[in-house]
């Protein structure tokens, strides 16, 4: 029986040896091309990962530079705070000096008012004294005239008295009497002169007080100018402090973005390895097993139709995963790009942060190009898988080995059922959400939440100020 079975197998092998050899050569060529393309793609992915690592290192250096700048800004902020304290103390001293000068100015004004009142009162007293002196002079002249008139009368009435009056002694006595009468009003003139000198002294004091008042007003204007300058410097210090707070918030946001990006790169690397593992293992599954004796060709011929559906399923799984990578959460990725663009427009003043933002956008573009290349490569691999599976499924040799002769309608029905099975597996894989997609959604949700919290804190600080 064994010999008969061996003879039948040998006859079948002689009849269809060139078919199996041609199919195996075609499969080997396709597997070699597939392995070559996969190796080239692996090298390209490694080069892109090296570029990403170098970009990541550059961004780490930039973040270190930004931290150093932040430290310097903090030192400058501390120095500004010290200067602000000194300015505050100087402003307080100037306010006290200003108040003291205002009090002195008020006291000087009151003193000037009192001195003007005293001068007016003294002037009125001088005028009254001058009027009294004029009255006394008038009365004295009237009295002298009356005495002369009476003397003349007595002289005319008594001729003996006329001789006495005309004598030298009488004239000397009359002169002495007149001089005594003239010396009488001299104290009033001295008082008048004293009052006039006092008025001159008071006027000089008033002029000095006016000069002091003008000097105090000039000092007051200088103090006001210094106070306005200090207020302006204080406003500039507040602006610097707010700018430092904004830079700290931006640095914190950049650090969060760096952490998220490194996490995404690590996840992408593991995901690329996981996706490329079944593709690199595919040629090993298609190779014939050496050392299987005379039954190796027959076993390969029988197992090839069974292996082709699983191979197609494996390739469709990888294609579905690549499509899921490219189409992962487009809404959240678009929202993240819009948020980054808005942040870059809002912070157009800082060149360093704008360069970091541009580099991050360039990195995102490289990442999308890499995903598109992976998708194209996956499409090429799927096309190659279809080319390798269709000749095997269309070949009638394995149908003859399995069950004799079959009609062309039954072959088409088997091929249709196989394609329906592959499509069902693809749909089931597309419906099941992969793990990395949920992880990316969670990462972008966390980033948007932190941005919302930072914006809320900024709004609270601005409202409190």
From Swiss-Prot:
Superkingdom, taxonomy of origin: Eukaryota
Keywords: Coiled coil, Phosphoprotein
GO molecular function ontology, one term from the record: identical protein binding
PTM sites of type Phosphoserine: 308, 318, 344, 407
Keyword Coiled coil: yes
Positions in coiled-coil regions: 31-64, 91-142, 188-266, 350-377
Region listing for Disordered, in residue ranges: 282-315, 382-421
Record-linked InterPro entries: CDR2
PANTHER family: CENTROCORTIN FAMILY MEMBER (PTHR19232), CEREBELLAR DEGENERATION-RELATED PROTEIN 2-LIKE (PTHR19232:SF10)
Family per record: Belongs to the CDR2 family.
This protein's name: Cerebellar degeneration-related protein 2-like
Species the sequence originates in: Mus musculus
